[in-house]
Each structure stands twice: as structure tokens, then as C-alpha cells.
């Protein structure tokens, strides 16, 4: 082989390597992107804070809480249209769908009550007093109980949904963050965000059966579960980490950087994607390669103050309410689709 051939082949090999690296980078960037599909203008006042969202897959409804004016929007996901506006829910934060009773429960901070909504009429039928700042909630279906974090009261209120009454209040030495129900382990998990602890509640006895440190995570507030693979995903708002927690070993196994102001976490098991809504103006996107390995796909730029999202696990669409755009007050819901799905 002459010198010219060797040099040509070397240049070709180098170019091929560069091309492969660039394609890999582009593929990774593309995989982390969210494609904006539509924006729905909401009828409430602009520039005021939104909070949790949840989906009723039976009726194809999306429920969006508008904390500022105390409004709940009901959207038909088949038409991408607001079909009902429910008012008189002062400071509404949390919202949880109870499918077996066709009811919806709201956490109404400004009056410290849990609202009960009949989905047949889309009317508020009862308000249940709590102690101080009801926030996130989780439904344990086999036990017919709703677990509501009473954040400032440092407690979890337990509601018997067959009677719509609080049957027990569990107290902690910490403000309580988002709870989640694990249908595989049949446990409720609650973030104790002042102590960096993940508490475990047994719904059969309504007793605390575990108090486990979350390692380097500081201010664990948001949470999503991959129950099948025994994993919890915790947003750490004080030090901008996503912590992956092993629910069998009761210990963290991975930490990944997220954008500032982390709040709500959602998991799409079909795409193996984890989404974290961050107040600074980003949705951090991660991939679960397998239960022990994770990688960050990117921080997708969205409007400032977007801190809550819903993920439709059937269509893989992401719903994010916006209260401002480039400093201009708005009230809208933006629909995204995951790229590379």
C-alpha cells in the first residue's frame, strides 16, 4: 500500500468517526426534544399560577388546576377543548381522579379544604376541612382511601372516599410533599421534604412502616413511580437533582442533574421517559435505559414558571399550563409530543 492510499484511508476513517459521533449527538438531541403541537387558550385570568393536572382515561378528560383564581378546567382530550369550568375552589392545588366512584378530589389551599366533585354532573358536592395547605394527593384504590399531603401542617390526611370523611391524620416532623400509591407493593410513599426522607405508609393499617433517607437529594418534593421495576423518581428542588430511588433496597441508586426550580415529575412507561417540570423555564427529560441505568436527554425550553405537567401514557403527549410568555401574562395549555418515540 502506498503512502497516498494510507493517508486517504486514514482521512476517510477519521471522517467516518466524526460523522458517527455527530449523528449520535443529533439523535440524542432529537430524542430529548418535545414537539409543540397546539396551544389552547384557557378562559380564566392571565398571569396567575397553575398547579397539578390529572387525566381521566375513561372519559378522556384532562383536569387542570388554576390556583390563582381557584378554577378547575375540564378539557376533552378528543377535541382539545375546554368543556367545563368549575369555580369556587379557592387556591386549588392538587387534583386526584377516583375512577371506581367517578369522583374527583381537589386540594383547596386558600380555604384548607378538600373538594369533592361528582363527575356525572361536574359539580362540587362536598368540602372536607383539613388543617393547613392540602397539596398533592394519591388514591389507593384497593383500600378506597385518598392520601392528601397537608403540607404546612406537616401531615397526611387520609380520606375514606366511600364516606368522604377524614378517618385518620398521620403527623411528621417535616412538611409533606407529593405522595404516590404503588399498586405493586401496595404502599403509599410520601416525600418529607424538610428532612430529605421518603416515608412509607401501609394503607392496610394506615401506619408508617418506613422512613428512608434519600441520599444527596435536598428538598424532595415531586415524585413519580415505575412500580413495575420498583423505582421512585424524586425531584430535589433545593439542589436540582433527579434522584432514582430503589423501592426494594430502600436507597437511592442514581442522581441526574435537572434544571432549576424542579417540581412535578411524570413517568411514561411506554417510552421509558421521565419528565420534570422546572419553574426556571424547562422540562428536563430522561430515559430509563433499564431499571439500573438512566441518561439525561436534555432540558427542553418552555415558558418561565411552567412547573406542572401531565403525561398521557396512551398518546405520549405532554400537557403544560403557561401563566406567562416572555414576560406577558397568559392563561393557556400547551400540548407537546415526545420526539423519537
Regions found by a protein language model. Name each.
Residues 14-28:
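Bacterial N-terminal signal peptides
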Amino acid at each position: 500500500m502506498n503512502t497516498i492510499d494510507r493517508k486517504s484511508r486514514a482521512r476517510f476513517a477519521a471522517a467516518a468517526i466524526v460523522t458517527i459521533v455527530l449523528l449520535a449527538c443529533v439523535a440524542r438531541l432529537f430524542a430529548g426534544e418535545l414537539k409543540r403541537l397546539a396551544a389552547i387558550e384557557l378562559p380564566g385570568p392571565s398571569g396567575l399560577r397553575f398547579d397539578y393536572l390529572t387525566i381521566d382515561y375513561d372519559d378522556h378528560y384532562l383536569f387542570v388546576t388554576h390556583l390563582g383564581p381557584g378554577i378547575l378546567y375540564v378539557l376533552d382530550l378528543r377535541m382539545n377543548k375546554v368543556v367545563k369550568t368549575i369555580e369556587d375552589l379557592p387556591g386549588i392545588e392538587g387534583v386526584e381522579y377516583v375512577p371506581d366512584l367517578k369522583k374527583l378530589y381537589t386540594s383547596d389551599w386558600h380555604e384548607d379544604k378538600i373538594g369533592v366533585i361528582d363527575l356525572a354532573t361536574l359539580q362540587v358536592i362536598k368540602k372536607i376541612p383539613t388543617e393547613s395547605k392540602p397539596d398533592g394527593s394519591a388514591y389507593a384504590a384497593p383500600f378506597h382511601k385518598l392520601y392528601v399531603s397537608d403540607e404546612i401542617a406537616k401531615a397526611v390526611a387520609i380520606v375514606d372516599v366511600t364516606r368522604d370523611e377524614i378517618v385518620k391524620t398521620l403527623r411528621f416532623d417535616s412538611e409533606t410533599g407529593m405522595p404516590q400509591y404503588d399498586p405493586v407493593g401496595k404502599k403509599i410513599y410520601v416525600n418529607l421534604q424538610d428532612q430529605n426522607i421518603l416515608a412509607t405508609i401501609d394503607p392496610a393499617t394506615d401506619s408508617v412502616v418506613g422512613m428512608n433517607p434519600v441520599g444527596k437529594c435536598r428538598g424532595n418534593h415531586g415524585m413519580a413511580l415505575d412500580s413495575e421495576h420498583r423505582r421512585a423518581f424524586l425531584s430535589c428542588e433545593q439542589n436540582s437533582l433527579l434522584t432514582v430511588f430503589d423501592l426494594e433496597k430502600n436507597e437511592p441508586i442514581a442522581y441526574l442533574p435537572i434544571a432549576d426550580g424542579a417540581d412535578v415529575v411524570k413517568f411514561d412507561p411506554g417510552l421509558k421517559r421521565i419528565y420534570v417540570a422546572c419553574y426556571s423555564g424547562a422540562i428536563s427529560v430522561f430515559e430509563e435505559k433499564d431499571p439500573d441505568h438512566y441518561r439525561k436527554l436534555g432540558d427542553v425550553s418552555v415558558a418561565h414558571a411552567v412547573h406542572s405537567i401531565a403525561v398521557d401514557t396512551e398518546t405520549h403527549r405532554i400537557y403544560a399550563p403557561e401563566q406567562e410568555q416572555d414576560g406577558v401574562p397568559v392563561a393557556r395549555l400547551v400540548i407537546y409530543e415526545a420526539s423519537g418515540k
